[in-house]
Amino acid sequence: LDSHPVLHRVAHDPAVKALIAAPILVCTVDHLTPATESQRGGRQIAPMLRLMSGDLVLDEPDDFDLDDLPALTRLVHWAGLLGSRVLLSSATLPPSLIQGLYDAYRDGRLHYQRNRGVAGAAVNICCAWFDEHDRAHQDCADSESFVAAHQRFAEQRAARLGKAAVRRRAQLAPLAASSRRREEIASEFAAQVMGHARDLHREHHTVDPDTGKRVSFGLIRMANIEPLVEVALALYKGGANSDQHVHLCVYHSQHPLLIRSAIEARLDQALNRRDAMAVFRLPDIRQRLDARPEPDQIFIVLGSPVTEVGRDHDYDWAVVEPSSMRSLIQLAGRVRRHRDGDCARANLVLLNTNFRHLAQPEGPAFCRPGFEGRGDWLLRSHQLETLLGEEEREVIDARPRILTRPDLRPRESLVDLEHARLQRCMVAPPAAAAPDTADVPLTPRERNKRRKAEAPAQLGAYTWYGLPRASLTAVLPQQQPFREDTTKRVDLVLMPDDSGERYELQQIWQERGRRAPLYVEIDASLHHRIP
């Protein structure tokens, strides 16, 4: 970059230099989304240049929240606009999400070929599908041909999944509370999930070859962090049976990064089960097993949705608080992940409802995370026994996610709710896909009549490329931002004292108009020093 006549102007910034110059760039998507969000001058230039010079690989794009899909669509559209290729990697890609991203890419590619390709050439996009069993490819000139090709591949994959050995079997368990008070709900919730954990441990343990103790590693997944902490305290207070010892690890995304990194390092070692007996040779596990006399040793990870993706962990069993079908599928993939063979007895317990419904039974329950909302998206029931069919909940795999039913019932089915919301967000309705009529001359009377007759246009992810000249302003990035976060955050730092032997917790205070930050010592009443 230093010798380039233009790019040498940004070579002084190490972050920009790394983003542009790296032959292979591995980064989170928030480094690239500014390419389409030019609200502040200059922030879009580096990711634009990166997309111009490389292809785009998106891992687990269906893991994004509904509110983030417009930004993801803008990024894929921009990749097509710049002539890049796009690879989507996930085992649970729903049809509407794929169709919406294809339509966005095709629209961008159309503009690219008009300016950089052969004049008048058809937009025939080479599309390919891969999984561990098969591969397929087809040139798709329009959305209809792409949808048909994708449907064929998804149906073949679903057929193979139906014949595969069943490594995860689920059973539905009731969840009830005698009060709406959060403290009592947390206490009863903890008692019930602990009972399920004991039952699953009894069925799915491994015998320690050195001591003969029965050992299992399980996961209790909860949807939200605040009730998770309350349940963790209730579990700690409740204790365990005299012949059992519970090793509890609380794992969520709001840990300080240093603590979260230490937790993940230990979990990565303990939950690598490719060699079933290797875990008993780990010093940390060995020390914990030898230190306790109880014959049953239960290792439990009480985790938030951060446990579902991103880590290659293998649990013996899991207890799941539901929030969406996608989360159930992703979490089920963490049970016996490294071990083959059929499972005869249930190793997953699905709670019939969740903590949020027990606390607020009149409102949406499967939301934040989840797809439920108010109005058209409010489920008529919040019990999995009515929201999921028997075949959908007994053997959990990707089939409900990769295929959709012709007639969706989003208020009666948790699976249909996800497909319907994705379809509304990603796929343009016929009116939104109509040709541009903005330049058709109209009389004032005709214009007024049309304005009264037309309903306000609904914003979707497709609005970016479907609405004429929408990209000329920053209105859509402002209305549909990527990962909008209104949480007030405080930056803390451990600063050494004058002796260099002790560290003091201080807050980084940045005043407007001041370049250098201030470091303000945190009051002793707000934190506790661990000896």
Please state what every model-predicted region is:
Residues 88, 98, 102, 107-228:
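Conserved interdomain linker/interface between the two RecA-like ATPase lobes of SF2 helicase motors
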Residues 317, 324-348:
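Conserved SF2 helicase motif VI
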